[in-house]
Amino acid sequence: YDEIETLVNSHCLVYQNLWSRISTRLKHCQIFHGLYVIPHFRTMGALDGNYIFSTQNYFRLINLELIKNRPTNVVFIDFDYHASNIGKLKWFDDSQYFQNKQTISFDALGEICYATSRLISSYFGKLKKCLVLDLDNTLWGGVIGDDGLEGINIDSHNPEGEAYLAFQSYIKSLKARGVILAVCSKNEENIAKIPFKKHPEMVLKLEDFSCFIANWNDKSTNIRNIAIEHSGYSVFAG
């Protein structure tokens, strides 16, 4: 393991020195660095994941070491995640490498551009900050105004209800990351709030929402009013 650790540290030191040189010459420069994609080939076949010196684990260790020593002005792009999205057999192109030293396929270029542009955009504040949600058949199964509290489905022992609860948990995690939550629903407000107040399995609570609009006005008008209250349309997702 000591020999592998030495190789990994030596490999990472090259990048660490490069970051340092960039930061010295360009003050306040934000560096975007792509992490290694773990190769899809396995030099030891099915045993590759069992040994620290395998090719795949070597690149995993490099990625982890880079992350462990990341300066504050360096942001990593997890290309291994994006390679998994499209499939690593589609990500790599050996013929492209031998012809022009391009290790990735043309299929992967779109994913790379998308991932990189999104990360850079978020750094400059170009990201969605407010999520507008409907209620019926969105946060629970059924229609609260027709089915009542007992009739809507957010039952953790029911497959459909479990899916709604999982969705609510994900929305809750977005709030924890700083996303503003709002409700826009065609409903009677007092009825629409009942599940949040009385259903024991609701993950989301009324206090999780910065704005709660439930009425019979058209949704476009309601969303426009929410946008005015929360600094414009560009920050919205729904």
Task: Give the predicted meaning of each segment.
Residues 1-133, 139-140, 145-151, 202:
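Extracellular glycan-modifying ectodomains
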Residues 104-111, 162-163, 167, 176:
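Extended, H/D-rich, highly charged conserved domains that either
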Residues 144-169:
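Basic, amphipathic juxtamembrane/active-site segments
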Residues 166-197:
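Substrate-recognition element of Asp-dependent hydrolases with the DxDx(T/V) motif
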Residues 182, 194-211, 226:
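Hydrophobic, small-residue-rich alpha-helical packing segments that form membrane-like cores
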Residues 185, 212-216:
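Conserved beta-strand/loop elements of the cytosolic catalytic core of P-type E1-E2 ATPases, chiefly
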Residues 217-221:
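Short acidic loop-to-helix transition motifs that present clustered carboxylates
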Residues 223-238:
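Conserved Lys-Pro-Asp/Glu-containing loop-to-beta segment of HAD-superfamily phosphomonoesterases
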